[in-house]
Amino acid sequence: MSITQSFFVLTLAIFGAASDNPIADRKCIVISDGDLVMHERKPGQEFPYYVYMIPKGTEYDDQRWILESVGGDHYKLKNKFSGRYLVYGTFDYFLTAGAAVREMDHFKFTADGTGKYDISSKANGHPRSRGKNWGVMKDGEKHYFTVENCQE
């Protein structure tokens, strides 16, 4: 392989990998843990606006999150269905609110190199899946979620 061909292949690999990164401003992502996906409960459901893990199936907007950069490597997560933001709620449960103005509601995604990310807030809290149909809670330990681009 010539030097020119090698450079071309390397360039494709670098830019191809960069375009696959789901973590960027205004990107739409889905956050999952095994066969469960993070979603926002809707008005009319028990505990509306709380964030729960439900079985994967057809991808809907209540499972989609839009990243909004707040500077540096932190983001607000806006639910595509409601337009509300992921925040820490009462008793360390995650829910959504009309604004994410507190720094503790700004999140960083740290890749583990396998397509999974530890999500941490500026207050060093980490969302943790507690299983099927349970609310997502804040934890002090790292927890790696699969983060993928939306299937739109």
Swiss-Prot record:
Q: Which InterPro entries match?
A: Ricin_B-like_lectins
Disulphide-bridged cysteine pairs = none
Q: What UniProt keywords are attached to this protein's entry?
A: Secreted, Signal, Vasoactive, Vasodilator
**Signal among keywords:** yes
Q: Which domain of life is it from?
A: Eukaryota
Q: What is the reported tissue distribution?
A: Salivary gland (at protein level).
A GO biological process held by the record? vasodilation
Instruction: Give start-end of the signal peptide.
Output: 1-18
Give the location in the cell. Answer: Secreted
Its GO CC terms? extracellular region
Q: What does this protein do?
A: Salivary vasoactive peptide; induces vasodilatation in bioassay with rabbit aortic rings.
Could you tell me what this protein is called?
Erythema protein SVEP
